[in-house]
Amino acid sequence: MLWYHLHIFGNNILFSGLYENQEDRQTIRVIEKNGIRFSLLAYTFGVNETTNYKSIQKQLKTYPYILGQLNKEQIKEDVNNAKAQSDVVIVAVHWGKEGHSELSDLQQEYAHYFADLGVDVVIGNHPHLIQPIEKINHTLVIYSLGNFLSTMKDVYNQLEGMVCFDFVKKEDEISIENIQYVPLVNHYNDNVVTIYSLKEYTSTLASQHSILKDQADIIKEFKNYVKQMISNDDIDIEMWGLYEEKNKSININNLYGWWYCFFLS
């Protein structure tokens, strides 16, 4: 199954975190856009205990290179290699506790470790809920964006986020500017899934949602939850669709961000 996923996309998608051999494991994924070189790294705390859990664990013992795991020594080597080849280092990380909006000790430990190594952006997932955003030194840490396409059953599994920001290069310095957070709703009925921005989501749509249909004030609750979870006095984050006086025109199809997918435009 692991080998199948390595080849299913061919050369059409650059991805990181799953590797075919040791040489592939040591190859940093680099992409250049608008004169800026980006390195993409990916790690996980482990694998879920699914029906083929024992088989995967056996593969990992036999072929430890196939999966990017949270190992500080390996991470340090990867980040140093990435920094030598690129201007920006982005890390996707599978961490935290499922169903918990609070940060785990492991998340906080590794967030600070990535920051100490000089990683530019950390984008996390696994909790299936949105979690805070913060800056540690110069590292932007997005702890969890929640789900994207999902038929999970809890109310707050339907609330998710996308993050948009600019990398600005001035001489030899690169900064992260214009951070925008776009709350999304995972809408489904009869297992047909559609993604809406929270700004566009209506009470009529909510009444047709398989999970949200009995939640009378869910749109208001979602907005309050996003404000509570994402607002950060230390970072200028525009909360798209939550504060009308700050709204700007955003093409939602061109936004950057979601879990392990990076769109550079």
Task: Put a short name on every predicted segment.
Residues 236, 254-255:
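Acidic, low-complexity intrinsically disordered regions
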Residues 246, 262-264:
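Intrinsically disordered, low-complexity segments enriched in serine/threonine/proline/glycine
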Residues 242, 260-261:
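Intrinsic disorder/low-complexity segments enriched in polar/charged and small flexible residues
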Residues 248-253, 259:
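Targeting/processing segments of secretory and organellar proteins
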Residues 3, 258-259:
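Tryptophan (W) side chains
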Residues 1-247:
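Acidic, metal/ion-coordinating pockets
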